[in-house]
Amino acid sequence: MESITISQLKNWKRNKKKFAAITAYDFSFSRLFSNCGIPVILIGDSLGMTIQGHTSTLPVKIEDIAYHTKAVRKGAPNTFLISDLPFMSYYDTKQALKNTAKIIRSGANMIKMEGGKWLIEIVRELSNRLILICGHIGLIPQSFHYLGGYKVQGRKENDANKLIDEALLLEEAGINMLILECIPEKLAKKITESLSIPVIGIGSGKNTDGQILVMHDLLGITEGKTPSFTKNFLLESDSIQKAIQKYIYEVEHSIYPSKKHSF
């Protein structure tokens, strides 16, 4: 696979070519995903739960993300890598710049930050330094205490309008990509069509430019109950490779997510 760039991902949006993304945390799985044709991998702070065994993403440190980013980059040299800035690692511009440098040096193409209007000045400062940024709005796991748990966001009209405003403000400030998590399908469609940057959905319906799943959910190895928007692709496949290829096919052809995976 040739190296994937942000320009290519933006072209896919313009040409209405959907793409599949996935989380990964190590060399072996990232190499497998890359060989299957996954163009975008997220080194997410979800590793706090899937790898470290915590009950949330909050204990994850910047050193954890840097370590796993290095491993994933070795396995997927040409894949577009997005790495999370974990909880309280970007509470001001100085801290955000310092920790972004660590992550980019570890091999990421882009950093991801959760939040809305309060992030604007930080986004603008990073963008002015030509750093690629992925925003993340809707259900933002680093703020699950404030949100009252892991709940769908944007159901009420005023909440939906707030998310639309935040998406537009973040794009204006300089984000290059946006993740929408657990918002109604119609709202995700409106936001996606309002932005010129690629929009990736998780639990937000099929009308975004791309989809992302946590690898453990996709492969059916998550401990306990999984979110209703996930799908175990390994159930219908006889190998991990075929499960990933099926996931890619269903995303590219708007089969997944279906209505039962959406809100």
UniProtKB/Swiss-Prot annotation:
Pfam families: Pantoate_transf (PF02548)
EC number: 2.1.2.11
Top-level taxon: Bacteria
Cofactor note as given: Binds 1 Mg(2+) ion per subunit.
Active site: 181 (proton acceptor)
Subunit field text: Homodecamer; pentamer of dimers.
NCBIfam families in UniProt: panB (TIGR00222), PRK00311.1 (NF001452)
Family statement: Belongs to the PanB family.
Full protein name: 3-methyl-2-oxobutanoate hydroxymethyltransferase
